């Protein structure tokens, strides 16, 4: 929910539809073909809601599906990789990336950074144990610290000056990671930068809304109470969550993605209570 929190910070006037594809987690171990299929299903459903923008708030789906789906929907689709990479090259020369296995294998961050700054040096580490520990509320446990030490050691050995959170779960680990890395290391949270890109895009398109936002609408493909409990710890309030069965996403005419995606809706749709210019995050 780190992207959602940034939406609240930078675009408080926008209403949000938030979709979490919890039934098909984790995305980080899925094949590129599976991830693309999930993304298309989710985006199709978002299109039915009349959204005006989608932020694909999952690094794995941003890395493996964004280019394939951009330009195929009646709204802009933004991803995390490019905004995060651009921020990193502005801050450092020796960049570490911690991410899921799928994101690391895609080399999406490395390609984006080298394209922006050919002399940049990049090291990537897959961190598959982080998400289960975070979702198990084990952020401050001895096990988390030991796992983090193991994952970060190769990056510390390279004397990195910048670290990218290559998964939207990872900013929750800041208290742990900052105790392990040099205080001079810059931390890059792509969520901050993708929402800043969304602000610029909305302004350029004349779609930015003014006024008071309506309450965020939360949907999940898995059990709603479980997601509500976890999300409440990170949001500071208890969200009202509705379950959206996979059968709805997979029906003809529907399409979606996994991970957090933010969509902004200009027109009402009978499937969802009408929203005036709503932002909708899709979460993996």
Where are these regions (language model features)?
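Non-catalytic structural scaffold of enzyme domains
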Residues: 1-284
């Amino acid at each position: 929910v780190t992207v959602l929190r940034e939406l609240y910070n930078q675009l408080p006037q926008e209403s949000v539809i938030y979709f979490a594809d919890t039934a098909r987690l984790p995305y980080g171990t899925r094949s590129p073909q599976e991830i693309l299929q999930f993304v298309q299903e989710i985006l199709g459903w978002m299109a039915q809601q009349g959204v005006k923008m989608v932020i694909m708030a999952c690094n794995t789906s941003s890395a493996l599906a964004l280019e394939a789906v951009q330009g195929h929907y009646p709204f802009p689709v933004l991803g995390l990789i490019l905004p995060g990479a651009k921020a990193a090259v502005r801050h450092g020369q020796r960049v570490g990336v911690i991410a899921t296995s799928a994101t690391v294998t895609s080399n999406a961050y490395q390609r984006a950074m080298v394209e922006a700054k050919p002399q940049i040096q990049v090291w990537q580490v897959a961190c598959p144990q982080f998400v289960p520990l975070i979702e198990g509320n084990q952020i401050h446990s001895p096990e988390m610290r030991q796992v983090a030490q193991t994952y970060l050691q190769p990056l510390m050995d390279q004397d990195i000056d910048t670290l990218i959170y290559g998964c939207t779960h990872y900013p929750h680990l800041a208290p742990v990671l900052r105790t392990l890395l040099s205080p001079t290391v810059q931390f890059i949270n792509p969520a901050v930068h993708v929402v800043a890109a969304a602000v610029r895009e909305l302004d350029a398109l004349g779609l930015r809304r003014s006024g008071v936002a309506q309450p965020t609408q939360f949907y999940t493909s898995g059990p709603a109470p479980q997601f509500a409990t976890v999300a409440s710890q990170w949001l500071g309030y208890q969200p009202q969550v509705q379950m959206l069965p996979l059968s709805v996403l997979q029906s003809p005419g529907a399409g979606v993605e996994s991970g957090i995606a933010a969509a902004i809706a200009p027109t009402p749709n009978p499937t969802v209570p009408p929203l005036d210019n709503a932002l909708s995050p899709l979460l993996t």
